[in-house]
């Protein structure tokens, strides 16, 4: 049975104390508000000094913790202390720190329930080659994908595979399409790898030089993949699973992004039975529990091909507003399994991140893209950050961006990389 978000008013479990990690992310802010609205007490642990949720009225307390990536042992020790001091009932990792939480999950479960699967399973899903191999072994549709572990392998593979099609090159450990190399279109007005609607294009490509990264960026420790380029529509999913059973699911269009293939800034619910069937089969076959997202291409043959997996919270959360039913999927998934229910967003749900969405609008003007469609999307979407009764995060986001910009300058990295540098996980301790 499918239940639309907002259609039911079931009594939730008694008020819980919920600890969220990853307070910098808009999904964490949105979920904190949903939990608060449902009567739960929300606490946040975050390694960044400036983050969206720290000033939210939905949050009881925030704690600044050590970097999960750079000081994992101290980070986990602090989470243990907070779980005890705040008498936490449920810990929900929201961003890439989920991998570090998984390392200490057994210790943390002494004090509270932890919504995370094993580190071994998380790694298999996060690794862009191992995930493809797993999905293929389950009989699910995925693109042809090759593992590249050296400059020599890169050159050898490139000389063979690029004679039979176009390819996307990307690190196996990456996020928000960072460092992705897309095929380049001949039409300079079109974005590399996408058409004027934001879909993957089948236009002819021009030859371009695709030199391999240096030995530091490409090795057996930091491999890349070459993945067959499939023209079609991009789709994303967000799901919550409990012991292999889906208790919440959303498929959404994310046609507006930061750059041509970067992080999504606009989210619109779509009905897509094939994407749902793919995710359901994967969850059942792997017995997965927790939050999980997938990126798909719907090819011209109408089949969906999974290109990546994100075993954590993704922006599909925003489509479940106001979120009472989604909260049930997180706090009492076993009840939904017994009831045979799966929560989905209301039909036509839309959400956006207003500031980067404005930047996307500028791209429409400069790139001669369909500004009218962008305006319609803007007018029909809820801003994730702005809530009249919780206004402070609107102002906080400017401080977050400024802090990230300063870090990006000092570290000589992109703004996106600066936003995740201290929580990202690249296969450490495997």
How would you describe each model-predicted region?
Residues 135, 143, 159-180, 194, ...:
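ATP-grasp fold ATP-binding core
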Residues 262-265, 270-294:
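Oxyanion-binding "anion nests"
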Residues 284-319:
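Conserved metal-phosphate-binding beta-hairpin within the catalytic cores
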Residues 121-141:
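Glycine-/Pro-rich loop/turn segments that contact NAD(P) or position catalytic residues
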Residues 184-257, 261, 268-274, 298-305:
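Phosphate-binding site of ATP-dependent enzymes
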Residues 177, 256-259, 310-323:
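Glycine-rich phosphate/pyrophosphate-binding beta-alpha loops
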Residues 1-117, 152:
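ATP-binding N-terminal substructure of ATP-dependent carboxylate-amine bond-forming enzymes
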Residues 200, 328-430:
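Peripheral (often C-terminal) accessory segments that flank ATP-dependent C-N-forming ligase machineries
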